[in-house]
Structures are given as C-alpha cells and as structure tokens.
C-alpha cells in the first residue's frame, strides 16, 4: 500500500514538508477531520470542498507505482481455491482500490469494496460488522481482519474479530502494540500460519 504517503505527497505538491509525526496524528482522524487539520496546520491554499479532489489525484498517482508485497498473490489464490470469501475495507475510495487491484491482477479475488470513511471509519466496529454481514457471516471470531494500522486492528480486536497484523514501514513505531492485538503478526505474507486461520 501507500501507507502514510498521500498526505505527505499532497503537502509536497504545495511546497510544504510533513512533520515527523504527521502519520500518527492523522491515524486517529477521519478523512474530513484530517483534511481540515492539513489545511489549517500547513496553511494549504485549499478549501475543504476542494481537498478531496486533490487528494484523489495524489492517491491515483501514488497507486500507479504500488506493487504487491511478496506472497500476496499466492495467499489470495490459496484462499480463493479454498472458498474463502474476501473483500476490501479501506480508508481509500473504492474506485481507486479497484483500479490498482485490477492493474495488479487480483481484483477478481474480492467480492466487494467498503469505504471506511466518516461515520463508518475503522475507529468504529460497525464497519467491520456490516462487512461481515455482507460476506454472509455473523460470528466475528470466524472472520479474519488483516490490518497494518494499529487503531483499526484495535477496533477489530475489541469487537471479537480475528486480527492478522501486518508489518508496514508506515506503522513501524506501532509494531509492539499491533502485535499485542493480533492473533498472528506477519512481517511477510509468506509467514502466515495456515493452522491459525
């Protein structure tokens, strides 16, 4: 993924430099609050209503270079072969997720996309329960949520979902806490313990 890169790339577009703690600051905010924060804190020449369009452009540009992490393609193929139902629940817009996953050749593994934004952000368990219901399930313990973001992993864990934590450079500082809320923590998708899935 692109992790914390989009806000920093947006700031660079306007000649601003992201503070070292920007990623951590934004993690606790929804998209609208994050936009207002960036505009105010970095004195961006943007109105709130224009921010989302600019951010979509920034993300689309970043997604042109995203590659799969090692082991993802094989993992998805195995899950699909075993009949697992899968979807994407992301803070990013669904059409952008679909575009990059189509380019990477894995879009057909996912039944649908959920935009975890606003009132349905990953700070609230409702987005996970609604996603589970759309997959035809009702027991959160029988559903694995794969997360590289601590706040989202905590939400899923507290709601009773099985959490597979994924190491990511953007959330390296949170790794010990992410490990503590994960049923499995992976530094590589190739390390997945299939006996625990």
Predicted regions and their residues:
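Short, acidic loop-to-helix structural element flanking the phosphoryl-transfer center
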Residues: 60-88, 94-98, 125
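Asp-based, Mg2+/Mn2+-dependent phosphohydrolase catalytic module
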Residues: 77-80, 94-197
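Helix-loop "lid/cap" segments that line or gate small-molecule binding pockets
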Residues: 10-11, 30-44, 100, 131-133
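Metal-dependent phosphoesterase signature
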Residues: 37-74
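Active-site neighborhood of HAD-like aspartate-dependent phosphohydrolases
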Residues: 1-24
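Short beta->alpha linker loops
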Residues: 26-30, 67-71, 92, 123, ...
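An amphipathic alpha-helix signature
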Residues: 4, 8, 31-36, 48, ...
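Residue-level detector of anion-binding/catalytic polar loops
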Residues: 17, 85, 162
């Amino acid at each position: 993924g692109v992790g914390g890169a989009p806000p920093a790339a947006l700031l660079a577009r306007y000649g601003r430099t992201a503070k070292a703690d920007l990623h951590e600051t934004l993690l606790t905010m929804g998209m609208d609050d994050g936009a207002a924060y960036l505009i105010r804190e970095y004195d961006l020449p943007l109105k709130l209503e224009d921010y989302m369009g600019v951010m979509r452009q920034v993300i689309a540009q970043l997604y042109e270079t995203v590659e799969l992490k090692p082991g993802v393609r094989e993992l998805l193929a195995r899950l699909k072969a075993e009949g697992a139902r899968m979807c994407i629940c992301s803070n990013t817009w669904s059409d952008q997720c679909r575009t990059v996953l189509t380019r990477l050749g894995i879009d057909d593994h996912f039944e649908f996309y959920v935009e975890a934004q606003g009132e349905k952000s990953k700070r609230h368990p409702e987005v996970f329960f609604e996603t589970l219901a759309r997959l035809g399930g009702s027991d959160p313990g029988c559903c694995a949520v794969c997360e590289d973001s601590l706040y989202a992993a905590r939400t899923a864990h507290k709601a009773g979902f099985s959490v597979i934590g994924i190491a990511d450079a953007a959330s390296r500082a949170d790794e010990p806490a992410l490990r503590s809320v994960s049923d499995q923590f992976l530094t590589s998708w190739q390390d997945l313990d299939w006996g625990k899935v």
